[in-house]
Amino acid sequence: MDEPVRLSLAEVHVLCRDTLVAAGLGEEHAQAIARSITRAEADECHSHGLYRLIGYVASVRSGKAERHALPALARATPAVLRVDAKHGFAPLAVETGVPALIAAAKEIGIAALAIHDCYHFSALWADIEPAVEAGLAAWCFTVGQCCVAPAGGTTPLLGTNPFAFGWPGPSGRPFIFDFATSAAARGEIELKRRGGEKIPPGWAVGPDGAPTTDPAAALAGALLPFGGHKGSALSMMVELIAGPLIGDLTSRQSKAVENGDGGPPLGGELFIAIDPAVFGTGNLSSRLADADELFALAKAQPGVRLPSERRYQARERSRTNGIAVPAALFAELQALGPRGS
């Protein structure tokens, strides 16, 4: 097996930007996606990292996504913001809307941002991290393609439907979790397939409805929700609030308009942000200290780690050592870029 190719984070960004521009994507979108992928790789979130570049390029070349669409920000009310992504990729739309969301939440105490008509492929923790670093509690929800069966079923009806929550953490490191409501993200299963690995039991069923550990069969069949009916209910919640609530597509509707190029699905994204300084009563420092105590007491128990701790550790390693890219993936990306086109 060929040795992995080691790249600095700056080289990851350049690789992404150059590959996307060579495919015909506009500079602003290419830079935003490059930032998104680089953040994912820095935190060793490979399912949303360089591997996703293949899908982005496919959607540019197929004409599915608008290459030069500039997102438009509008204010429905002082606390409700909207970004029309105009059939473009989500990262630039997120970068357009989140600063306004932060400002509105700090002014009013609570604010929401709906992003419409976007192709979303990125990790949600990165979407809300700026708001949490600004001292806000924040949530984010998005709907994916129809590939998950509801609890007890075997036919896809729901998306992987991830959501994220963040809280301003101690030492400037926010408490953020981000996970799919399926047993695993579809990207994780795709990486298992590419690597020739099995998936754990309970993640999916094959096209015949029988449980499977074959990732190819899982992708052809249906993923399962985590936690049975609990994960299924949470997935439906995400469908409702990131779909009909904001006037965007459900996962089933998204799949119906999908062209099969392997790129990101079309849909919407909902953000909610609350400023503890405005929203709560009593002394803010005391309330934040109560939260810090909760984190400290949890970590004091052997075997406990908080969400996002591993990402921050990975981030420190990546800044120093760069990242390792599987040789086969690097060769595939090189073929997509300026040298291969």
UniProtKB/Swiss-Prot annotation:
Enzyme class: oxidoreductase
Annotated keywords: NADP, Oxidoreductase
Biological process terms in GO annotation: proline metabolic process
Keyword Oxidoreductase: yes
Name of protein: Delta(1)-pyrroline-2-carboxylate reductase
Enzyme Commission number(s) of this protein: 1.5.1.49
Keyword Acetylation applies: no
Lineage per the UniProt record: Bacteria, Pseudomonadati, Pseudomonadota, Alphaproteobacteria, Hyphomicrobiales
Residues given in the record as substrate binding sites: 52, 160, 186-187
Reactions performed catalytically: L-proline + NAD(+) = 1-pyrroline-2-carboxylate + NADH + H(+); L-proline + NADP(+) = 1-pyrroline-2-carboxylate + NADPH + H(+)
Species name: Ancylobacter novellus (strain ATCC 8093 / DSM 506 / JCM 20403 / CCM 1077 / IAM 12100 / NBRC 12443 / NCIMB 10456) (Starkeya novella)
Positions that bind NADP(+): 120-124, 178-180, 229-230, 305-311
